[in-house]
Amino acid sequence: MILLRSVTGVPEAVLMDNGYLTDIRTACAGAIAAKYLAKAHVETAGVIGTGLQARLQMEALHIMRPFKRLLVYGRRAEAVDAYIGEMSAKLGIVCETAAAEEVVRQSDVVVTTTPSREPIVQQEWLHEGLHITAMGADTELKQELDAEVFRKADLIVCDVKAQCLKYGEVHHAADYGVLQREDARMFELGALTAKTVPGRENDRQITLCDLTGTGVQDTAIARYAFERLMKMKTV
C-alpha cells in the first residue's frame, strides 16, 4: 500500500505488505460485524471454505466471541484436514468437519469465504439466533447465499450499500425480487459502529452481513500501521 497525504497527495509511506493489510482488514470487518450482530454468547462457529480468509476470519471472530467449537466445510478433504489441524492448535478449540447444511444448522455464527458461483447456504437451514457473514461474493457473478435466505433475515448489513447492490449477496437478492433496494431491514456497517442504528436486539433474531470490501478500510488500516511503526521508531 502507498499512504498519501490527503491534502497534497504527497506519498507519506510505502508499506510493502503484499496484500497482508487488506487480508487483515477484511477479517476485522467480519469481527466488527459479529460484535454488533452475533449473540453475546457464541458456543459454536462455522466456516464455509478453507482458504486464507477462512483462517483469518475465525481468528478475528474468536477474539470477539471466544467460541469453543468450530465446524468446517470445504470441497477438498485434504484442505479441510489441514485447516482443522492448524486452527485447532492455534485457537485451542475443538474443530470438526461437517456438511455445509450441518455447519449452518449447528452454528451460532457462520462465515462464508468461498468464490462460489452457485448458492451454498439455503433458506431452510437458517435458525433463530443465527448470524451469517458472507464475504466471498466480491463480483457480480459470485454467490454463496441463496436469495431466499434474505426473506428470513431480521437485520441485513452491508459494508457499502450501493456497492452491495451492484455485486454481492444483496445484489442477487434484489435482482430476484426477494429484497427491496430500500428495505427497512438493511443498513451499512458504519451505522452500527457510529451507533446510529441498533444491532442485534435479542437472541432470536437472524442477522446477515454482506461484505464486498471497501477502500476506506484499506486507508484506515494503512494509517494505523504507519502510526504504529512511527511510535516504534522502526522507519
Language model region names:
Residues 49-51:
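Glycine-rich Rossmann-fold phosphate-binding loop(s) that bind the pyrophosphate
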Residues 37-44, 66, 127-128:
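Short helix-loop-beta connector
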Residues 92-178:
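Rossmann-like adenosine-cofactor binding region
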Residues 63-90:
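NAD(P)-binding Rossmann-fold cofactor-contacting core
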Residues 1-42:
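Phosphate/diphosphate ligand-binding glycine-rich loop within oxidoreductases
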Residues 54-55:
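N-terminal Rossmann-fold NAD(P) dinucleotide-binding loop
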Residues 45-46, 207:
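Conserved beta-strand elements of the Class I
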Residues 141-235:
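Adenosine-phosphate binding glycine-rich loop
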